[in-house]
Amino acid sequence: MSPNIRDICALFLPLNGVYPNCATFRLEVAGLAEGRPSVLVGDFILVKRRDASTEWYKGCVHEVSADTVNLRFSSNFSTYKGKKFDVRFVLNRLPLRRMHQALTLKTDATRFLFPELEHVRMGRVNTEQLSSITPINRLIGEDYEQLMTVAAIVHQPPGSVPFIIFGPSVHVYFYSVVSVIHDVNCRPGTGKTITVVEAIRQLLARDPKVSILACAPSNSAADLIAQRLRVLGPSQLFRLNAASREYKTLPEILRDFTLFNGNLVFATPSIERLKKYRVVVATCVSGGIPHGLGVRQGHFSHIFIDEAGQCMEPDAMISIKTMADKWTNIVLAGDSKQLGPSVRSHVASALGLNKSYLTRLMAREVYDLRTATGTTYLSIALLQTLRKF
């Protein structure tokens, strides 16, 4: 049985008066701190008395601590001290539902799902384009390769093929169609995320119409992007959090960039308010929230996905399929050589779900250095010093 779906025998401790018109109880759960089972705010837990009763009651989790969860039931649920219950932890299907929603959306997705040479709209960065970039981060200005990468992203025409930044955390590999791969030894602090942040700030500075959705597989990775963009201020930057996230896990310096209610539960702004932000940062799963609010496809001129090598392709598609139109540019940053997506199903893994979107794209001919020809510029900057592949 999945570690997230199991039955246990448990005792409830009543929490009288916490919520009016609700039966509120505290449930002790062994292994909660280790994520076995994984329980988040907003999850549902089913309980049934251990006697002859066959009726299951549904409780909603409204607080999670190291070894207990607080549950709210309807007012018709009651118990007394010492009464034993069977407890069933139910898998939270919201991420799966958002993946299915994204995959079933009808859209002209050939350009970013199965890009071909005919979809490429840009040649190599020229001297004029490169000189037009005034680095905001001095580390970028001191690194020619990183600067060239930023220039390439900034000057991509709308509707280009996905732009890929790839390599391990201490190196960035630059990819262009000259039958070579360029290995750049980066200075500390000039990795992929720094390059992504610089590109975002350059895009914002050059065009007031630019609107960006920046995603990452985990809250920690998304928080890192938001922290490095906080110079934009709360009027331009919004850190979009799922209601299931614990408030205490958000870095304090980002609290002015998000929205939460009086119970310290993260909330979602109105569509009008969300559309006013120039940069929205979220996890890949929460990247589907704007679509749920009614934000139209194409509202975001650019979609960035950092650590794209670690998320399943359906995760990446949540933001791309719901928010991209034929003019939206997509930028992926990640390392196809590192550990890929975590897939529990052996069947799904064998059928390819353990291969990230970034990895699959890089295997296509349009990104293949050995078969691509001519001067077509595909993914990242051409370096002055070439190293034979």
Show which residues each predicted segment covers:
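Short, compositionally biased segments
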Residues: S2-N16, V170-P188, A381-Q384
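Pre-ATPase regulatory/linker segments immediately N-terminal to the P-loop/RecA-like helicase/translocase core
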Residues: Y19-A23, A30-P157, Q227-R230, R239-N261, ...
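Walker A/P-loop NTP-binding motif
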Residues: V154-H155, F174-V180, T193-D207, R228-L229, ...
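Pre-Walker A (Motif I) flank of P-loop NTPase domains
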Residues: P158-I165, S179-V184, K209-V210, R278
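Conserved RecA-like ASCE P-loop NTPase motor core of nucleic-acid helicases/translocases
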Residues: I164-S169, P188, T195-R230, F238-L240, ...
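Hydrophobic beta-strand scaffold positions of dinucleotide-using enzymes
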Residues: S169, P188, V281-T283, D306
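Conserved helicase motor core of SF1/SF2 NTP-dependent helicases
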Residues: D207, S218, L232, V285-G287, ...
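Conserved helicase/translocase P-loop NTPase motor core
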Residues: F266-G298, D315
